[in-house]
């Protein structure tokens, strides 16, 4: 009898812990990228495609992770001057790229869209913006796009 009470208590404890763990949001259990060391060399800017900042309290260090065109991730010290310079350049390139995409979409639709008052073209781009054309009543709603 005493063994069954102990076993029942143990089973109840395991069930209570399982419910607590399973009720956690997925973001908490998601894999986390942390940097434990930084690159000692400057990376050639021409090899970089993007970056992300690591600021999680679950990581031992704040870091910048540069993503190369070959999809390799390299940890860098966010306090280094060359890292800050590369971040500014990548941010400028991203803005330039988005502006070019918006311009191409707007100019293409201005020249090739049929004249139809109720026509709305949905294209993919990186912000939610409404462009009105000057040659017709056509409007273009640009929603989100990611460039690879």
UniProtKB/Swiss-Prot annotation:
Alphabetized UniProt keyword annotations: Chemotaxis, Cytokine, Disulfide bond, Glycoprotein, Inflammatory response, Pyrrolidone carboxylic acid, Secreted, Signal
Cellular compartments annotated: Secreted
Pyrrolidone carboxylic acid PTM positions: 24
A molecular function (GO) term: cytokine activity
Disulphide connectivity of cysteines: 34-59, 35-75
SMART domains assigned to the protein according to its UniProt record, in alphabetical order: SCY
Subunit relationships: Monomer or homodimer; in equilibrium. Is tethered on endothelial cells by glycosaminoglycan (GAG) side chains of proteoglycans. Interacts with TNFAIP6 (via Link domain).
Protein family according to the UniProt entry: Belongs to the intercrine beta (chemokine CC) family.
Function, as annotated: Acts as a ligand for C-C chemokine receptor CCR2. Signals through binding and activation of CCR2 and induces a strong chemotactic response and mobilization of intracellular calcium ions. Exhibits a chemotactic activity for monocytes and basophils but not neutrophils or eosinophils. Plays an important role in mediating peripheral nerve injury-induced neuropathic pain. Increases NMDA-mediated synaptic transmission in both dopamine D1 and D2 receptor-containing neurons, which may be caused by MAPK/ERK-dependent phosphorylation of GRIN2B/NMDAR2B.
Protein name (database record): C-C motif chemokine 2
Organism taxonomic ancestry: Eukaryota, Metazoa, Chordata, Craniata, Vertebrata
